[in-house]
A protein has these predicted regions:
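C-terminal/domain-terminus segments
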Residues: 56, 61-77, 96-103, 153, ...
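Loop-to-helix entry and N-terminal half of a specific, functionally important transmembrane alpha helix
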Residues: 131-139, 143-147, 155-193
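Long extracytoplasmic/lumenal interhelical loops at the membrane interface
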Residues: 69-76, 80, 94-148, 167
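Transmembrane alpha-helices of multi-pass inner-membrane enzymes
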Residues: 11-14, 178-191, 195-234, 239
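Lipid-exposed faces of alpha-helical membrane segments in multi-pass integral membrane proteins
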Residues: 5-13, 36, 40, 151-161, ...
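Cytoplasmic membrane-interface segments at the C-terminal ends of transmembrane helices
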Residues: 11-28, 163-175, 215-227
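Hydrophobic alpha-helical segments of polytopic membrane proteins
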Residues: 1-54, 172
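Flexible juxtamembrane loops connecting transmembrane helices in multi-pass membrane enzymes
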Residues: 25-33, 41-90, 99-103, 107
């Protein structure tokens, strides 16, 4: 469901930056950020409506309706692990450390946070996947916090900022390609909601694509445009 939304978002951003314009000046970065926020909200609203109405399949419809009924929001209901993560952050702000095995108190605190948003925590997912001898919080940033504490959390936020800023920079210059828009959006999603063991390589690839494209675009836009006069072969030199 989310991948369809990211493809649609990338298409909207590409079409927007190729709109006719009467000026060649770059757009303000804050305005571009506002545009992305509005586009995300619009796509989320439209996507939720399509899912609830069953236009994207009956199975997706049933799951979406159930998640909204349980938590009141598709995003919160679809990824309830953050509710458990926030509960753990309140109990242990500095994280847990590499190789730490969750205690029964840790599991109870996470379950309490997830139950607060209407999530069923007695289906084996929390006990076996999330806390079965390890911390798997289904978020790269959250997993980095649990494993490496504040330093890991800060590194995750830096990667998130790099992706967002690089995308905004290229959109303001009208140099963002469809792949850059797609990979940047996927990278941000994986940092927030993707398991670290599966999606960290995807985030590294997204960073490589977006930062390389941003550096190349900056070098192109800042290169001198004045042509150098080359004397014709055989021509006389001018004083």
């Amino acid at each position: 469901r989310s991948f369809f939304g990211f493809c649609l978002l990338a298409a909207v951003l590409v079409m927007w930056q190729h709109r006719p314009s009467t000026t060649s000046k770059r757009m303000n970065k804050l305005a571009v950020f506002g545009l992305i926020a509005v586009a995300l909200f619009a796509l989320y609203s439209v996507g939720t409506t399509l899912l609830v109405q069953g236009y994207l399949g009956q199975a997706n419809q049933q799951r979406t309706v159930q998640q909204i009924e349980d938590s009141g929001s598709l995003l919160i209901g679809g990824r309830p692990e953050w509710a458990g993560t926030l509960a753990l952050m309140r109990e242990q702000p500095m994280g847990f450390g590499l190789g730490t095995v969750p205690t029964s108190q840790d599991v109870w605190a996470a379950k309490a946070g997830m139950r607060a948003i209407g999530t069923d925590t007695e289906n084996g997912y929390v006990d076996n996947y999330m806390f079965g001898g390890h911390f798997k919080l289904h978020s790269i940033i959250a997993d980095m916090w649990a494993t490496f504490g504040i330093v890991g959390f800060a590194l995750g936020l830096i990667m998130l900022f790099a992706l967002v800023y690089s995308l905004i920079e290229q959109l303001s210059n009208r140099t963002a390609t469809g792949l850059v828009c797609l990979f940047a959006a996927l990278g941000v999603w994986d940092l927030a909601f993707g398991p670290i063991y599966k999606n960290l390589p995807d985030v590294m690839f997204a960073l490589a694509v977006t930062l390389t494209a941003s550096a190349f675009g900056t070098a192109t836009t800042e290169s001198p445009t004045d042509s150098v006069e080359v004397p014709a072969v055989g021509g006389s030199a001018r004083a």
